[in-house]
Amino acid sequence: MAGGVGAQIVGRHIYGNLYGCEQQILKDEAALITIVKEAAKVANAILLSIGSYRFGPEGGLTVFAVVAESHISIHTWPEHGFATVDVYTCGDHTDPKAAFDYIVSKLKPRKVEAFFGDRSMYRE
């Protein structure tokens, strides 16, 4: 029971599936790195490091940022026009939904499935 009686919300998590994205942006490592960096700013998160991994010469990409408040990631499957996005932040000063929405605006999917959750700590 997330956020129930006696719970303190310590983090907010939004993640989703993006369908019908243009293949070119999903293959563009430099563009995806820039998008993740900007998403960290939009979320008001402190960027600590960023990395990426390409799965073969024509394969998809994983781009991830470690932020002081947790993480942001994009995983792509260009051959399917598909990406997954994950934004998790701790602290009231951050806005993971704003970061998620920013990434969606840049990847321009035809369809988005978004899921929200909180991470709660229960007092004993």
Swiss-Prot record:
It catalyses: S-adenosyl-L-methionine + H(+) = S-adenosyl 3-(methylsulfanyl)propylamine + CO2. InterPro entries: AdoMetDC_C (IPR042286), AdoMetDC_fam_prok (IPR003826), AdoMetDC_N (IPR042284), S-AdoMet_deCO2ase_core (IPR016067), S-AdoMet_deCOase_pro-enz (IPR017716). It comes from the Archaea. The record marks E69, S70 as: Cleavage (non-hydrolytic). Heterotetramer of two alpha and two beta chains arranged as a dimer of alpha/beta heterodimers. This is S-adenosylmethionine decarboxylase proenzyme. One of its GO terms (molecular function) is adenosylmethionine decarboxylase activity. One of its GO terms (cellular component) is cytosol. SUPFAM superfamilies: S-adenosylmethionine decarboxylase. Pfam families: AdoMet_dc. The active site is at S70 (schiff-base intermediate with substrate), H75 (proton acceptor), C90 (proton donor). Binds 1 pyruvoyl group covalently per subunit. Its cofactor is pyruvate. The modification Pyruvic acid (Ser) is found at S70. Keywords: Autocatalytic cleavage, Decarboxylase, Lyase, Polyamine biosynthesis, Pyruvate, S-adenosyl-L-methionine, Schiff base, Spermidine biosynthesis, Zymogen. It comes from Pyrobaculum neutrophilum (strain DSM 2338 / JCM 9278 / NBRC 100436 / V24Sta). Belongs to the prokaryotic AdoMetDC family. Type 1 subfamily. It is an enzyme of class 4 (lyase). Pathway: Amine and polyamine biosynthesis; S-adenosylmethioninamine biosynthesis; S-adenosylmethioninamine from S-adenosyl-L-methionine: step 1/1. Catalyzes the decarboxylation of S-adenosylmethionine to S-adenosylmethioninamine (dcAdoMet), the propylamine donor required for the synthesis of the polyamines spermine and spermidine from the diamine putrescine. Is synthesized initially as an inactive proenzyme. Formation of the active enzyme involves a self-maturation process in which the active site pyruvoyl group is generated from an internal serine residue via an autocatalytic post-translational modification. Two non-identical subunits are generated from the proenzyme in this reaction, and the pyruvate is formed at the N-terminus of the alpha chain, which is derived from the carboxyl end of the proenzyme. PANTHER family: S-ADENOSYLMETHIONINE DECARBOXYLASE PROENZYME. Its EC number is 4.1.1.50. One of its GO terms (biological process) is spermidine biosynthetic process.
